[in-house]
Regions:
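Membrane-proximal intracellular helices of multi-pass ion channels
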Residues: 1-482
Length: 482
């Protein structure tokens, strides 16, 4: 690994994240709230950036794959640690709790260790939502879009941070694509904030919830989340923005250039919409038959919760802990799958589900016709054996990690259903789980061991395992290669 190059790029990222703290600092100034936690946190960011810049290389032209992975993984770890300080220095959280809150925000998980949001300063509430927005599209993507000075290494870093087996990484002009993705991201955020304001939210709440929605994060300014707002039009608008944020943002760029038909031609997005529709129908029928709800109420409850958990946003409008077990199992499946590759959603990704299904049918056809050459295709694209192997490996790591986290959380005292639900919720970055960690619960009373497990699980889920796990390979740190 080229330590000088990696240090130089992480220095730029940490300095940029220090500048981001100006926004909550200004919020604190205008609201006459404590500003020192943000000033000290900014100082730490700039001091670390200066140290890394001193150790780093002045001019970065290229990155090899290993350096790109190192920059992405280490910058996420570094920024997660730096962003715990506003919480800790405010005297609101312990260091471990502050780290969990920081990681939950940046990874878009959206679960909180705060027991009561109503007592928090507005600057802290805004900072929480801002971490969602920064991590949603991706720290690296936003960095490349605003400060495109990493040379050809930009593609390496974005490749390591991207979600799904294929996404914006396939575009050769990566800097232009990063700018286009950021423009779409910003447009959606501003649109959501304006519509939420028109539908009854105050401006501060609208901005915070817009950050959370488009980043598919889930942090709210209210303890009750979206359930606080008893407004059907508002809930429908939140559903709309959660769903569009679950699609590959690259298709919006393509739709701008080639027309809206691109959206309807995208196989992955159509499959995602079908999954949400099927879950909504099944859950609403279950609620009508077992809970006696009227059809309109059942449909709205089912649609909102299906959109929230499939997009891994995690907003709560209804307590699904009171739902029948059949509906809860469907919600777990939605969290496990998640949204589309190249979106702000977490989870396994619909793309991988499609490829796993296509691979299964290809194997069955190969059994019938042993001499046939069968190519796996999805969305009009051929997938190589190496790509399919990566999908299978990711599926294995994803599921085995969930089982491992379940065992560790259960060892800390949780029952198995609660531990399994929490493991899926953190690996998929969806937030709310089931049982002890359900829709109306927070993580304030969670054992320290469990908090450490979920912190690692959230990071692994956001960086899609490979980027983080590769740091544990001894060969990764050798100077002369693998």
């Amino acid at each position: 690994m080229n330590t000088a190059v990696v240090s130089a790029l992480i220095a730029k990222l940490t300095a940029g994240c220090g500048l981001v703290l100006l926004l909550p600092l200004l919020t604190a100034l205008f609201g006459e709230e404590p500003v020192l936690p943000f000033i000290y946190s900014m100082a730490l960011c700039f001091l670390l950036a200066a140290f890394l810049r001193y150790k780093g290389k002045k001019k970065v032209i290229n990155l090899n794959p290993r350096d790109g992975l190192a920059v992405t993984a280490l910058s996420w770890i570094c920024i997660s640690i730096l962003y715990l300080f506003p919480y800790f220095l405010s005297g609101l959280l312990s260091p471990l709790d502050a780290l969990v809150e920081s990681i939950s925000g940046l990874t878009g998980t959206g679960a909180t260790v705060f027991a009561d949001l109503t007592v928090l300063p507005k600057s802290i509430l805004f900072f929480r939502s801002l971490t969602h927005w920064l991590g949603g599209l991706g720290i690296i993507v936003i960095f490349v879009a605003l400060f495109p000075q990493a040379g050809k290494g930009s593609a390496r870093m974005i490749d390591a941070e991207s979600t799904g087996p294929y996404s914006s990484r396939a575009v050769p002009r990566i800097k232009e694509m990063a700018k286009a993705l950021f423009a779409v991201y910003l447009l959606f955020t501003v649109s959501a904030a304006l519509i939420y304001t028109l539908l009854g939210m105050n401006f501060f709440d609208a901005v915070n919830h817009a950050f959370s929605t488009i980043a598919t994060g889930g942090f709210s300014t209210k303890n009750e989340s979206i359930a606080f707002y008893d407004s059907t039009p508002l809930k429908l608008s939140v559903i709309f923005f959660m769903v569009i944020s679950s699609a590959n943002f690259g298709i919006y760029v393509a739709a701008w250039k080639r027309g809206i038909r691109v959206l309807w031609e995208n196989t992955e997005f159509k499959v995602y919409l079908s999954i949400v529709a099927a879950a909504t129908i099944l859950i609403s029928l279950n609620l009508m038959l077992e809970r006696g709800l009227y059809a309109p109420s059942a449909l709205l409850e089912a649609l909102f919760t299906s959109a929230s958990l499939s997009s891994t946003t995690g907003f709560i409008s209804y307590d699904f802990e009171a739902w029948p077990h059949f509906s809860q199992v469907i919600l777990l499946i939605l969290m496990f799958i998640g949204g589309c590759g190249g979106s702000t959603s977490g989870g396994l990704k619909v793309t991988r589900i499609i490829l796993l299904f296509k691979s299964m049918t290809a194997v069955l056809r190969q059994k019938l016709h042993p001499r046939a050459v069968i190519q796996t295709r999805a969305g009009g694209e051929n997938f190589s054996e190496s790509m399919l192997l990566e999908v299978f490996c990711f599926f294995f790591i994803y599921t085995m990690s969930i089982f491992l986290w379940t065992a560790l959380i259960a060892a800390s005292g949780a029952d198995i259903p609660s531990a399994l639900g929490l493991s899926i919720a953190t690996m998929s970055n969806s937030g709310p789980a089931l049982g002890q960690f359900g829709a109306t619960c927070n993580w304030s009373a969670m054992p320290a061991m469990t908090k450490m497990v979920v912190a690692l699980s959230m990071l692994m889920g956001r960086l899609e395992s490979f980027t983080l796990l590769i740091l544990f390979l001894p060969s990764f740190w050798r100077k002369n290669g693998w």
